[in-house]
Amino acid sequence: ILDTPVNIVVTADPTRGGRHTLGRHTQPQMAPYSSALAVENLWLAARAEGLGVGWVSFFDEREMVRALGLPEHLEVVAYLCVGYVDEFPDEPELMQAGWSKRRPLSWVVHEETYGRRALPGEDPHDLLAETVTNIRPLDAKALGEAWERQKRMTKPPGALGMLEIISAQLSGLSRMCPPPIPEPAAVAIFAGDHGVHAQGVTAWPQEVTAQMVANFLGGGAVCNAFANQVGAEVCVIDVGVACELPATPGLLPRKVRAGTADMTTGPALTREEVKAAIEVGIETARDLVAAGNKALLTGEMGIANTTASAALISVYTDTDPAEVTGRGTGINDEMHTRKIEVVCRALDFHQPDPADPIGVLAAVGGLEHAAMVGLLLGGASLRTPVILDGVSAGAAALVARAIAPEVLAACIAGHRSAEPGHVAALNKLGLRPLVDLDLRLGEGTGALLALPVVQSAARVMHEVATFDSAGVTEK
């Protein structure tokens, strides 16, 4: 910045023009927007003359106004650094550094009404169907190369155990050997409330969901501590919290509805609401991957959501609810018995059909479960590994597999929860957990602890020498 020949500060004056000035009176924000468009014109003109323009964003607006002696009422729209450059890169530096990727136009264009996705001149497309179409199995060529490389690395065959399986999976998923190291990573915590809470299945009041969302955003939860330890981003998404949450930096407001209905008296959700929540998960996966993340982790928050998880797992494992319904937040025997009875009552009432995954979610699922289904499908369609957390993620994975069986190519079981339903889900999915610490918290905590293990599995493929390159004699 200091070496740039010319620095330009562009401001907008919101006090200019009276109520008859077109655009200013009814839409005050048009003033800085118009100034930003003027900056774009300047940028294009400078580029045509061989000049580079850097748009600086790391400054405090009020501090800059005072430092430059600007009138206090001015809004700083842009701080630009202008000068000749040695050469222009083929693509923006943010993309080169992996900080940002250009999104396909089809991701963001809606026709006539929001949610009706269509490019000009093309028929509308369904986001879920489009996503499922792009989910493919592991690449056989890269998978074979990974196993061959494992044989040549300076270690006894099979010495790295599960890490060898994970590294081969990452290779097949990415179609590359060695595979990309899955960093940076982001944990997506979907928050939603449950109408079945009214049946007395947990000792915690429903407002704890919103309070914990605030805790996540304030950096005070266990998931924040673990994320800080492993260098992961925490992304919090309100997909169905019962109350209105204040606008807070870091919170993505994607509420489909204010909590589910009581699944013992009727469907928890409509089919349309299920699809909307799945789309929230798909779009979250797309946004996080477009932002440069190489791995996605599942997280959730919702008081009473283990009741819905037990119902989903019972449906997809064909297991007695008594065997897959756990104690969640540590309920006593009496409440545990009631919780089992509630799950049985809901399943008897709805008789959900496993062949209709949307219908199963509508009957007994949660908004965060549906959103996690979308995250898994979205991650798999982008060939990005998704590390699963606990019992709720296991339930979501069962539903996602019913929608698109090849989704499991992208799934890695981060840990085994203390919840009995999680064991049943993992067995049905055929996934082996990487960590077993009797965790039963959720929030993505188990997935976060597993992240360094997954990253290590990829790193050894890059950094461990082969017998030939190291000059080590084989057995």
Task: Name the predicted role of every residue range.
Residues 30, 51-63:
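GST superfamily/GST-like fold recognition
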Residues 1-35:
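Glycine/small-residue-rich phosphate/adenosyl-binding loop
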Residues 127-475:
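N-terminal loops that bind phosphate or other acidic moieties
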Residues 79-127:
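C-terminal helix-cap and adjacent tail motif
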Residues 1, 69-94, 270-271, 275, ...:
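A glycine-rich helix N-cap at a beta->alpha junction
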